[in-house]
Regions:
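Helical segment within the ABC ATPase nucleotide-binding domain
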Residues: 102-115
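Conserved D-loop-proximal element of ABC-family nucleotide-binding domains
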Residues: 98-103, 148
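Walker B motif beta-strand of ABC-family P-loop ATPases
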Residues: 86-92
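ABC-family P-loop ATPase nucleotide-binding domains
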Residues: 5-85
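Conserved beta-strand-loop-alpha-helix hinge in the C-terminal portion
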Residues: 140, 144-167
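Walker B catalytic motif
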Residues: 92-93, 100
Length: 190
């Protein structure tokens, strides 16, 4: 399983290539295979970096250290491409990205996904779904799933917003507002 964070952590002192090589080799060993030679790994990494439109210079930079939001998300999508999990949870991968960066992220996820990888995309915006058509759409409000449907539900939410959902589930909407108020209070007191 792979988890893509809304706000990826910076890890100074660990460069991207070394982090990915160690992760990749750990996965190989876990699957009963031998570790890959560093030169062979570099070839695989270079190819995957092209797949996610990432400049090779990022191999030597520390993991997410000083990266822009778009660079962090691309680095995370590169990790997803290299590790090829059976299932991935992408938590607001589009958060803080401009329209071009969201498009690149969406296209990259579509290129590396496939029938052998389940992906749960958590998003507030439909643009990330342009190249990743959902089989199922679930709406979470107040900490619970209140409505489910297919891609048409995602399209409806994009066009009409969440007002219908909030009105249809007033208890969940009230719980959501209370959770938001608590988060704001925590932010101002910390």
């Amino acid at each position: 399983m792979f988890l893509g964070f809304q706000y990826p952590v910076e890890i100074p002192g660990v460069n991207n290539a070394e982090f990915l090589r160690m992760s990749y080799n750990a996965l190989l060993v876990h699957n009963g295979e031998e570790e890959i030679d560093p030169l062979d790994f570099d070839e695989i990494l270079d190819a995957k970096m092209k797949t996610v439109d990432m400049d090779p210079k990022y191999k030597d930079r520390f993991l997410n250290d000083g990266f822009s939001g778009g660079e962090m998300k691309r680095a995370e999508i590169l990790q997803l491409a290299m590790l090829r999990p059976q299932f991935a949870i992408l938590d607001e991968t589009d958060s803080g990205l401009d329209a071009d960066a969201v498009r690149l992220a969406s296209e990259s996820i579509a290129r590396i996904g496939g029938a052998e990888m389940g992906i749960l995309i958590i998003t507030h915006h439909e643009q990330l779904l342009e190249h990743n058509i959902p089989l199922q759409t679930h709406v979470m409000l107040g900490g619970r799933i209140v409505e489910s449907g297919g891609p048409e539900l995602a399209a409806e939410l994009h066009k009409q917003g969440y007002d219908r959902i909030r009105k249809a589930y007033p208890e969940a909407a009230a719980a959501e507002e209370a959770m938001e108020a608590e988060r704001r209070l925590e932010t101002t007191t910390s």
